[in-house]
C-alpha cells in the first residue's frame, strides 16, 4: 500500500505474517521493518528500531542501487563463475574463472563459513540476517534489472555475506595468490587447472597494484592545529570504481543506540569509513605483512612429503570440484587436488615459487583466522570517543590490512597501525628467513618448527602481534598517512624500532606522503581549515614535477642534440604546463607521465639520492649530467612524442579530454607522481583512459557544539546500474570539484530538497 502526506511519499511494502484465519485475527508479527530516507544523490539514511530491521533496510537499499554488482560478486565468492559464464572467461580482476572458482571453493568451504558465522555476536547475526532478507525482498518484488538478467542472479544467504567478508579478509594475503594456489601440483603431475604465463603476469601486476588500487590518503587534525580547537578528518581512500571493493555511501541509525554515516564495501552491513556524533575515522592500506611464506624442504623419496624437525610428514590433500559450462551448455565437473602443510596451502608460482623435487612453498595468511572483522567495525561505528574507538581495536584486533586514522570532538587525533600481523620478530627473521629473498615477500624456513609464528597469550588470535606491540600515535597537532610505513605519521614523533614485518623506518617516503607533510608544514602559520583539507585533494598538484622540472627544462635547453626539432613541441608543452592534473591541464602532463614512468625504472636517476636524515626532501632532481640518465631521458622523450602523435593528441589537448569515467572528465592522476588525488586508469579503444580506481569516498569532517559537520561525495556515484539516475550524478559533481554537505541530523535530512521516504516491513 502507499501512504502519502504533504512532506514526502511513503511507500509501505509488507508481507504480514502470522495472521490468524479465524474471526479474531491477532496483530501481525513484524519480522523486520525499516525506514529508508533518501537525500541528494540518492544517499540512503536507514533507520530502524533493532539490528534486524537496520540490516533489512541496508540490504533493500543496496539492492535498489547495486543488485547486479552484488549478485556478480556472490557468484565469484561462491566459486560458480565457470558454471554460469564458462571456465575460460575472466573476472573483473582479469582472473581466469576456473582458477577463481577453485580458489574460492577452497577458501569458502561450508565448514569455514559455519565457523565464521558461529563466531559472530547475536547482534551481528541479526544485522546480517536482516540484510539478506532486505536484499531478497527487493529481488522478489522487483526482479532483476536489464543489466543482469540470468539464472546466476539469485536470493542470497547469510553464508554469502560471510563469503564476501572472507574474500575481503584475504585481499592482503592469499587472495593475491589465487592462481598459484589453484594450480599448485607436484613435479610430473598435470594440473587440472592450467595457468598460462600470461595469467601469472596479470596476477603479478595485480599483486603489485594492490596498494595502488586500494591505497589512500588521510589526515587527522588535533586541537592545536584545527580552526576551532576540535578534531578534523580528511578521508580520501583510493579504491576500485568497479567490482567487489566499490564503496557504498549510507547513514545508519537505531535511535538511542547508533547514529553513523559513511561508506561500506559490498555486502557489509556496517560502516567501514565514516563518522558519528563524536568520532570520525578512516583507513589507509598499510605496509605491514599479513602473511608469510614457508619454504618446505621435501622428502627426497616423495615430493608430496616434507621434512619438519627431521621427520617426514605428508602434505594434506583436498580435492576441489568445480562445475564448468561447456560450449554446448552442458556442465562438466573439473577437479583439482590442492595440497597444504601445517603452515598453510602450497602455492606454486613459476620462476618465483617453484615446486620441484627439493622444495615447495606454503603460505600462511593471518587473516584466515580473523573472524572479528565485522565485530570490529560494529564497535567502531558505536564509539563515543577516540579512546573508546582505540580500546575496541586493541581488544578485538579485527582490522585486516589497513591503518586507522581518527579525530574526535575533543580535539585529539590518532594514528594506529593496528592490523592483523604475523608475530615474526626481527630476531626470528634473522634466524629463519633467507636474506636473499628480501622483505617484499617474507620466506621463512619450513623445515624447523622454531620458525613458526610466535604466540602471545594476550592476542585475539594465536600467532599475531599484540596491539601494544604495534605502532600508534596520539597527537594534538596532526597525524597523516599515504600508504607508507608508520615511521613518519608525524615527523615530530617518528615511530621506529619495529619488526620489519610491522613497519620499516629510515626508508624512502612515497611522494604523496612528502606532499602531505610539506603541505601541512606550510600551513603552520595559521589554523588548518576545511578549505585547506579540501585543497590538498582538489588542487591536483603534481608533487614530482616540483622536484624534477627545473632539470627537465635544463635538459630541453641544452641536451637535445640532433633531436632538438623533434622534441621541441614536447619541451614547449612541459614549459607551459601548470604542473597540475586538472581538467584544463595541458599536454605537458601527458608527456610528464610518460617520462616519469620510463625514468623510474632507471637506476641512479636522481641527482640527489635518498638520505634517511632528510626523508622529506630526498630524493630530488634528475641526474641529467650522467650519460645513462641523459640517454634514457632522450629515448623517453622520443617515445612520448610518438605515443602522443599515435593517440592524435595535439598542443590544444587537455587532461579532461583524456582521463574520463564514461563520458565524464576526471581530474587527478597517477599516485607515483605524488598526485594526492590519485587515479588509476586503463586505455580505451578511442584513445582515452578510463578510471578504474582512485579517489572514491571523500569526506571532510569537523565538529562543533551541535556534533559533526561533514562534507563529501562518492566519486563514482551511488549506483552501478547505468539506468539509474544516481549512476553518474556524483561523478559529475566530483568532476566539478563540488563537495556537498552530508545531512546527518533528522532536521538536515528532512530539509534536503531531494528528500524521499520509504517504509518497508516484513
Question: Which residues are covered by each model-predicted region?
Answer:
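Bacterial N-terminal signal peptides that target proteins for export
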Residues: 2-11
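Sec-dependent N-terminal signal peptides
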Residues: 10-18
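N-terminal signal peptide c-region/cleavage motif recognized by signal peptidases
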Residues: 20-22
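C-terminal/peripheral segments of proteins
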Residues: 26-554, 560-563, 567, 572-762
Amino acid at each position: 500500500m502507499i501512504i502519502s502526506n504533504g512532506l514526502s511519499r511513503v511507500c509501505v511494502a509488507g508481507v504480514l505474517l502470522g495472521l490468524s484465519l479465524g474471526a479474531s485475527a491477532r496483530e501481525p508479527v513484524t519480522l523486520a521493518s525499516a525506514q529508508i530516507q533518501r537525500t541528494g544523490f540518492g544517499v540512503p539514511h536507514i533507520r530502524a528500531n533493532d539490528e534486524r530491521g537496520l540490516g533489512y533496510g541496508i540490504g533493500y537499499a543496496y539492492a535498489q542501487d547495486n543488485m547486479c554488482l552484488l549478485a556478480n560478486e556472490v557468484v565469484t565468492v561462491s566459486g560458480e563463475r565457470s558454471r554460469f559464464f564458462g571456465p575460460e572467461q575472466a573476472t573483473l580482476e582479469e582472473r581466469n574463472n576456473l582458477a577463481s572458482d577453485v580458489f574460492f571453493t577452497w577458501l569458502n568451504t561450508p565448514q569455514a563459513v559455519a565457523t565464521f558465522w558461529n563466531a559472530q555476536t547475536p547482534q551481528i547475526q541479526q544485522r546480517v540476517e536482516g540484510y539478506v532478507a532486505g536484499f531478497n525482498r527487493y529481488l522478489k518484488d522487483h526482479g532483476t534489472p536489464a543489466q543482469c538478467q540470468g539464472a546466476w542472479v539469485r536470493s542470497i544467504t547469510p553464508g554469502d555475506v560471510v563469503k564476501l567478508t572472507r574474500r575481503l579478509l584475504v585481499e592482503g594475503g592469499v587472495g593475491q595468490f589465487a592462481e598459484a594456489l589453484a594450480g599448485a601440483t607436484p613435479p610430473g603431475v598435470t594440473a587440472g587447472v592450467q595457468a598460462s604465463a600470461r595469467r601469472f603476469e596479470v596476477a603479478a601486476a595485480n599483486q603489485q597494484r594492490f596498494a595502488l588500487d586500494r591505497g589512500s590518503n588521510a589526515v587527522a587534525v588535533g586541537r592545536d592545529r584545527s580552526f576551532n580547537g576540535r578534531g578534523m578528518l580528511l578521508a580520501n581512500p583510493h579504491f576500485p570504481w568497479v567490482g567487489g571493493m566499490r564503496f557504498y555511501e549510507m547513514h545508519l541509525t537505531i535511535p538511542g543506540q547508533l547514529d553513523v554515516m559513511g561508506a561500506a564495501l559490498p555486502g557489509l552491513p556496517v560502516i567501514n569509513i565514516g563518522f558519528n556524533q563524536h568520532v570520525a575515522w578512516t583507513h589507509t592500506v598499510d605496509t605491514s605483512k599479513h602473511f608469510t611464506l614457508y619454504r618446505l624442504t621435501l622428502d627426497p623419496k616423495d615430493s608430496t612429503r616434507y621434512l619438519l624437525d627431521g621427520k617426514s610428514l605428508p602434505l594434506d590433500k583436498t580435492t576441489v570440484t568445480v562445475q564448468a559450462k561447456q560450449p554446448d551448455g552442458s556442465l562438466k565437473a573439473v577437479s583439482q587436488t590442492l595440497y597444504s602443510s601445517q603452515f598453510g596451502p602450497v602455492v606454486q608460482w613459476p620462476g618465483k615459487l617453484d615446486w620441484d623435487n627439493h622444495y615447495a612453498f606454503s603460505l600462511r595468511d593471518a587473516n584466515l583466522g580473523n573472524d572479528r572483522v565485522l565485530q570490529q567495525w560494529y564497535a567502531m561505528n558505536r564509539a563515543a570517543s577516540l579512546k573508546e574507538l582505540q580500546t575496541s581495536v586493541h581488544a578485538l584486533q579485527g582490522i585486516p590490512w589497513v591503518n586507522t586514522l581518527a579525530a574526535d570532538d575533543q580535539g585529539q587525533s590518532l594514528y594506529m597501525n593496528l592490523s592483523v600481523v604475523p608475530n615474526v620478530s626481527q630476531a626470528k627473521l634473522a634466524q629463519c628467513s633467507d636474506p636473499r629473498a628480501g622483505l617484499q615477500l617474507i620466506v621463512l624456513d619450513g623445515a624447523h618448527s622454531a620458525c613458526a609464528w610466535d604466540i602471545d597469550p594476550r592476542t585475539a588470535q594465536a600467532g599475531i602481534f599484540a596491539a601494544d606491540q604495534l605502532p600508534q600515535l596520539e597527537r594534538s597537532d596532526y597525524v597523516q598517512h599515504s600508504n607508507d610505513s608508520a615511521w613518519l605519521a608525524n615527523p615530530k614523533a617518528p615511530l621506529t624500532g619495529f619488526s620489519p614485518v610491522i613497519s620499516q623506518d629510515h626508508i624512502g617516503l612515497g611522494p604523496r606522503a612528502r606532499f602531505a607533510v610539506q603541505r601541512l608544514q606550510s600551513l603552520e602559520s595559521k589554523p588548518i581549515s576545511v578549505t585547506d583539507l579540501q585543497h590538498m585533494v582538489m588542487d591536483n598538484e603534481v608533487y614530482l614535477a616540483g622536484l624534477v622540472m627545473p632539470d627537465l627544462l635544463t635538459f630541453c635547453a641544452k641536451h637535445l642534440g640532433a633531436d632538438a626539432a623533434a622534441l621541441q613541441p614536447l619541451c614547449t608543452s612541459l614549459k607551459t604546463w601548470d604542473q597540475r592534473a586538472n581538467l584544463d591541464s595541458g599536454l605537458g602532463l601527458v608527456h610528464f607521465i610518460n617520462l616519469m614512468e620510463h625514468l623510474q625504472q632507471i637506476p641512479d636517476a636522481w641527482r640527489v639520492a635518498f638520505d634517511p636524515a632528510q626523508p622529506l626532501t630526498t630524493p630530488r632532481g634528475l641526474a641529467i649530467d650522467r650519460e645513462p640518465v641523459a640517454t634514457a631521458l632522450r629515448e623517453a622523450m622520443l617515445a612520448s612524442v610518438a605515443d602522443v602523435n599515435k593517440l592524435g593528441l595535439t598542443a590544444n589537448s587537455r587532461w579532461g579530454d583524456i582521463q574520463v569515467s564514461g563520458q565524464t572528465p576526471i581530474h587527478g592522476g597517477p599516485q607515483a607522481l605524488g598526485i594526492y588525488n590519485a587515479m588509476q586508469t586503463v586505455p580505451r579503444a578511442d584513445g582515452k583512459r578510463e578510471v578504474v580506481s582512485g579517489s572514491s569516498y571523500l569526506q571532510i569532517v569537523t565538529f562543533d557544539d551541535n556534533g559533526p559537520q561533514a562534507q563529501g561525495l562518492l566519486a563514482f556515484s551511488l549506483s552501478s546500474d547505468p539506468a539509474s539516475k544516481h549512476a553518474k550524478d556524483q561523478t559529475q559533481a566530483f568532476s566539478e570539484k563540488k563537495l556537498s554537505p552530508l545531512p546527518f541530523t533528522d532536521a538536515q535530512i528532512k530539509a534536503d530538497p531531494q528528500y524521499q521516504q520509504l517504509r518497508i516491513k516484513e
